[in-house]
Amino acid sequence: FESLPSEQARNRGGLHTRGLSDELVCIPCAVDLKGNSVSRIAKLGKCSKDALHKVFDGRIADNTIICSDGDSSYKGFAENNNLNLIQVKGGKKSIKNFNIQRINNYHGQLKKFLDIFNGVSTKYLNNYLIWNNVLMYGKVYLKNRISILFDATASAYISIRAVDVNKRPTIPILV
């Protein structure tokens, strides 16, 4: 017998690496007490202090208090950027008045939002993150939301010819 050619196992949802690996995308997220949020693709694999710096550079004021989980990358990021860090270790949700419930809620809403689309390509993930932030955390009037969304789409790279689709950058980053 000769076997029929078939797709590779990974394309059918098989063989993959467990845990944090280069198959997962690192998306650092931040939400402040006013409801402003920042999230953007940093890299593939486990998050690092350089990846955090890439996303949050210039967006967090000096001497700000950051509340995060026990990941060691936040410690290096806080030391390099003159920030105060409170880490909530695993199994706990708060330390005194500081908690990670706000960011956990953000992650839950983001997952629900992305589940609607049955998987999003990494190439377009930043655009979906912006869309989610405008819908969920844009604490502004509808007219302002529309102008923010219009500005984000107008500044995106748009190609008219179908031939140029393959020449687009793999991860469009909207600022």
Model-derived regions: residue spans:
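Residue-level recognition of single "structural anchor" positions
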Residues: 1-175
